[in-house]
């Protein structure tokens, strides 16, 4: 089977040749540049498009565009940019890939156990091809979905992915577009969904050429923390909106992805009658979503339940940040930074966010709790994982709570093997930008007591150093066998007793906190059964009465209440 998404942007191979289109409204003329200094004038239309067609080009041909200032720029819709964003693009024939994942239609969201990974640090090689070698391991653990951090082409050889500047081109440091497709189809053959993290709120600070020939892509009406805001609601925004809608469709159709994770939708500024996030969600639902499961996961600091309305927006789920913050405070005892907002009634807030997230009108599977992710680990000065910050018994209780709830658990790469390697912030900038990022990173932590002194801040790793990247690679040779066995056991329990009882309907859940750290949560499941959690997230015993039903799992001691860092999960049959 072959798959391709045709779009009005960039280069398209067809009929023995190729068409080239560039939206460059600021340019009077544009030339297509090919090998051996060949240039072809492009035809300009009144709406700022420049186009031409050629018959003597094939897949792999390098091309770029010469704009008014005389310099060459890559195709902003390039499917491949092997020579970094500053270099030329390469023609790709999407129909050259023969898909071998059969009649894969995805999986319903109630089956999701999501595993976030960064391609560059997931394996020693840091490539799409090498990641295939870990798929059997993930399937055996009980993972059912990969959530891959952004792969859009970025400057240099290492980056988290949120500084991408060519959103259609997988970064060449990970491999080719063909390599990425092989990773996805091999995941499908093992029953694993694949979601891709995409960034639609800004372009990276280095390597973005759009302002030179299409400044209309940006607006001064809005601001973002990371650079110029994208123009989704001003003059010429129609083309800009189409660019990102097609990008979403391109990834899901041409790469046969099972969905997307939209980064920081609170920073996607759009005052249009219909927000761009809704247009993207509807395009996915009305397109590839008609024939298979296509999921849309959001990151949204504003916790807006309207964006998760199943009928209006077609969005699937959102990361449950409040649950993480409360669990982290209870397990680690940390209260600095934003954790300071979660030091009062922490147990009650934890129970509430577990019972119904931030809205009782949404089903449990609309929320994704987590103990670790790239933000919560990587935005620490030293990138420490929770395994280094919490007592082992606290970590075990929190892991069981994460995996044995009706909400959809999100794991961070290496968590299942008890990885203790850091996940640091890293990039590959140079010159003034590199210095600004390094110093900005250190100033960011000046308000934390442990980094108040300049000497302490000087020890924060330089994000531009290759050492920060290399230190962040998972150490598979030192996997914790006991931790892995626990994840296998807990996810088997989830698969057998919880997943079959989950659906897309909001249901009643009760919660309470009866002592510091002691939480009670009772969920009503789709078949009328009730799942009861009684957990003590503290180092002191708590007088919690046992819940009715059959015990699915227990942590610590539960005789006459709950001992420190203890909990029980019971399943009560429908009445």
Task: Label each residue range with its predicted role.
Residues 83, 277, 281-453, 533:
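Conserved alpha/beta catalytic core and glycan-binding cleft of carbohydrate-active enzymes
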Residues 24, 59-63, 558-575:
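C-terminal beta-strand-rich structural cap/linker in extracellular carbohydrate-active enzymes
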